[in-house]
């Protein structure tokens, strides 16, 4: 009689899990929770329960693989539900900002990290993002000049977006690694 696959083996064999943890540093990959969202309802599905503070999503419709601290999970849940309702990017951003201001969802803590990967050659392949709510370039000594084009050439440096707002964050392109240089491993 053939043996049924154990849930752990089925999880390990799911290619979405390997894809989802791709942007993470090696020491965070094995313990990351992996979730996916139903496109029509926004409902969360846990593909693998993790043991650390990181949660990842396989490639979404926008082409990005994302990982983030679990403190951001309610924000991602809300985003998934709004996208299932066919809300525009601006409507999603505005709703999340309003919910954060109202205290319905928590703002990320200063220094909270997120990780993003894309295999689209018109996007930065490997990008780490540090949340710095309400910070300004003067407070941190960081540029606000986008390094996107330089990062696409493998020469990007960090820059701040949305300075002085609760959504302020520093974009950190990761250059000269096998993954950022186009290797899929």
Regions found by a protein language model. Name each.
Residues 4-11:
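Sec/Tat signal peptide C-region and signal peptidase I cleavage site
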Residues 11-185:
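Primary mode marks residue(s) on the alpha4-beta5-alpha5 output face of response regulator receiver
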């Amino acid at each position: 009689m053939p043996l049924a696959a154990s849930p752990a083996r089925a999880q390990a064999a799911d290619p979405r899990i390997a894809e989802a943890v791709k942007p993470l540093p090696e020491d965070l990959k094995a313990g990351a929770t992996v979730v996916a969202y139903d496109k029509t309802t926004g409902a969360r599905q846990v593909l693998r329960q993790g043991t650390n503070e990181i949660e990842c999503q396989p490639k979404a419709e926008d082409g990005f693989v994302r990982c983030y601290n679990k403190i951001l999970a309610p924000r991602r849940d809300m985003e998934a539900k709004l996208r299932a309702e066919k809300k525009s990017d601006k409507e999603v951003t505005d709703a999340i900002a309003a919910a954060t201001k109202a205290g319905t969802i928590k703002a990320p803590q200063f220094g909270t990290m997120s990780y993003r990967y894309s295999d689209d050659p018109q996007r930065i392949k490997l990008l780490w993002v540090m949340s710095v709510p309400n910070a300004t370039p003067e407070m941190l000594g960081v540029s606000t000049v986008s390094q996107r084009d330089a990062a696409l050439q493998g020469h990007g440096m960090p820059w701040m977006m949305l300075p002085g707002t609760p959504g302020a964050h520093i974009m950190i392109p990761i250059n000269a690694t096998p993954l950022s240089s186009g290797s899929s491993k």
